[in-house]
Curated annotation (Swiss-Prot):
GO molecular function, one term: structural constituent of ribosome
Assembly, per entry: Part of the 50S ribosomal subunit.
Keyword Methyltransferase (UniProt): no
Function: This protein binds to the 23S rRNA, and is important in its secondary structure. It is located near the subunit interface in the base of the L7/L12 stalk, and near the tRNA binding site of the peptidyltransferase center.
NCBIfam families cross-referenced by the UniProt entry: L6_bact
Protein name, as recorded: Large ribosomal subunit protein uL6
BP terms from Gene Ontology: cytoplasmic translation
Residue segments, region Disordered: 157-177
Species this chain originates from: Caulobacter sp. (strain K31)
InterPro entries: Ribosomal_uL6-like, Ribosomal_uL6-like_a/b-dom_sf, Ribosomal_uL6_a/b-dom, Ribosomal_uL6_bac-type, Ribosomal_uL6_CS
Name of encoding gene: rplF
Amino acid sequence: MSRIGKKAVAIPSGVNITLDGQTVTVKGPKGQLSWTIAEEITISQEGSDLLLVARDDSKRAKSMWGLSRTLVANMVQGVTTGFEETLELVGVGYRAAMKGDALSIQLGFSHDVNVEAPAGVTFAVPKQTEIKIAGADKQAVGEIAAKIRRIRPPEPYKGKGVRYAGEKVRRKEGKKK
């Protein structure tokens, strides 16, 4: 029995949900998201709640039940409030700037790194050493943040690199003489 799957997804006012077979489409003030639910899950709308139920007791149905409920809840939250990820650039000469819709980052390479924003995701640079990534799709926001961090991850000796806001970097002691 999935404890997460049993909970109903509350639908706030201003959000419109369309069920078309196994496809769920959520429309709200921040945009529109759609996702196809696994065949093992039944979805129904009762008033201002969305209920998901596993069709049988198979292991796959139980595992998809909680996942499906969480993904639908994330879609509802995404079209109402959206998701945001903040990255910090730590290091001498590490800075970011906007060039149109693209992000240009200087990370100590011989060239600038240019990152294009995927559909539905926006970049903002409030400070030269800070990048804000926002969008309605939690997966897309997290994926582009991870791709930017992967360009120059924080190194353990000086802590230089791209890190998530508030991320603690494990530091190592240098060589001893």
